[in-house]
Structure formats: structure tokens, C-alpha cells
Amino acid sequence: MSAGADAGTIAAIPVESDDGHRFELLAHIPPAARRSLLWLPALGVAARHYLPLARALAGHGVAVFLHEWRGHGSSQLRAGRDCDWGYRELLTLDIPASQAAVASAAPGLARIGGGHSLGGQLAACRLGLDHGAFGA
């Protein structure tokens, strides 16, 4: 999907958490990016719903990476009696896997984190666990 010559394109980056959970990180990287943002969605909202935000920020030089929660969108998992998870998996496995993918896809860019609703809360919780989680 193209967002225009100046804004870059959308790419799906495969990510695997340390426990084997696989999902895709949606990336919108403009040609002259100055910083990167790992965006954590609200509870129950698939990453793709934030593509308009990613396009707008890319137009201002921000490489945007949209995290996908377990059980939504590109995640291989779906909650059920035999498959559940909690904040521990999100904060210590999935978000760090996305952070590593961002660092690999956008080396040298200043890194920031943010989110919508529960995503913002979990971004703050991640910083509580690792004060350098979103640092350059």
C-alpha cells in the first residue's frame, strides 16, 4: 500500500516473541525519517486501524511502527480455554520483540513510544520495567 512518494510506504515486518508468538508490525517509514514511534493500540483495536495516524506522522518525518496485540489482527493467537495470556506476556515478551524490530528496521533514529488508551498505559508500564525502553 503506497502512501505517496514523500510519505513512504507501509510494510509488514514479521516479529516473533521469545515464546514463539508471531505477529506483524506495520511500519510506515518515510524516506527522510528523523525519529521512530512504536505505537501501542487500544485494547481490542487492530494495528491497521491506526494507519491514517501513521500516514500523517510519516508526513512529518516520523517512522511509525504499529504494534499488534496478541489475539488481534495478524497475531497467530486467539484467546480460548487452551490459550490465554496477561500483561506479563505483553510487557516482557511482545513489546520488547516489537522494540527490537523497530531498532533493526530504523537504526540510528531516536525512538519514542506511545499508545492509545490501554496502549498508552502499557507504554508507561514498559518504561517502568525498563527506563531505556524507548530511548535512542
Q: Predicted segment positions?
A:
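Active-site glycine-rich loops that stabilize anionic/oxyanionic intermediates
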Residues: 34, 42-45
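N-terminal cap/lid segment of alpha/beta-hydrolase-fold proteins
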Residues: 1-29
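The conserved beta1-alpha1 loop
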Residues: 38-42, 68, 116
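Short glycine-enriched nucleophile-adjacent loop
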Residues: 120-131
